Amino acid sequence: AFRIAQSGRKGPVLVDIPKDITAAVCEFTPKKPEPIRTVVTFDEQQVKWAADIINGAQRPLVYFGGGVRSAASCQPLRDLLKKAEIPATYTLMAAGVVPYGDPMNIGMVGMHGCYTSNRAVADCDVLIAVGTRFSDRVALNPKTFAKNATIIQIDIDASELGKNVDVDLSIVGDAAYVLNAMLPLVEEKKHPDWMKMIHEWQAQDYHPVSDASRLMPHQVIGEVCNQCGPEAVYVTDVGQHQMWAAQYYKYRSPRHFITSGGMGTMGYGLGACIGAKVGVPDTPVINIAGDGCFRMNMNEIATATRYNIPIIEVVFNNHALGMVRQWQTLFYGKRYSQTCLLYTSPSPRD
């Protein structure tokens, strides 16, 4: 199961053990773990075509996702951005691949992303998508997503290529190997006009303002990061607090921001935080949760206590299922149902 989980497109594996097997008495002979097999083959001609397209671009943009979080993929991606001066935007699952403060990092894209990234997607002429699946949180309208761009998609899973958004060139392969093969073929160049546009948009990005009368989300996230430092591991549950953490956490490296994408499973954070702490016992591990998520799985505190696993739990308590309530406000005429967690009052506190 672990070998399968770490092979090809990495992901969870269900181990389903029937009850009769759990009750049986049998001999156990340990097997030597099989080597992890990763798909590394790719079409070299397609890589050359991709490099030619990138070399001819005036407004190139890299859009990357969780598929490039492995250490082997991060460096060639950063090298590509630097060599060809290509700005990059990313999904929730890829936070930290390109460090905060890197001039080529223009922020998270999509529904919960920043103005600059979404504007860059709309205006780029070449989009290089690496290890990402064009989810509905990014490509809200697949027919108009990056409609002015030639789209190149690189993914280890062939079934993801062109699945949600039509692409012009698709490359099946491990991102690390494909990017390393592409690097010598991509020309070193500058895009002054394109970067000028990027900087103008960045001036219009939303920047939260502190309010002396109440504690604001960015202040909480900022102080947690200041106290725990960039080497800590930050885990989040699912909801508004998750997006605040993604937006305001000043990440420096991959795998220091752990969250649940895709299914968005509430209650994920506490168990993941315990697991992360077991993996890096000498590193501070913090779980950022909402009061709704905390209620989903707070029994795991007993696990942490029983095994003496020291974790830090930060709970945003607004007495509501905040993200669901936000959608009820925006799309359902403020018809609130089952989202208030403060039962003595009809509405949550701010």
Can you describe what each PLM-predicted range is?
Residues 19-42, 194:
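Aromatic-enriched
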Residues 1-30, 50-53, 118-152, 181, ...:
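Structural signature of the thiamine diphosphate
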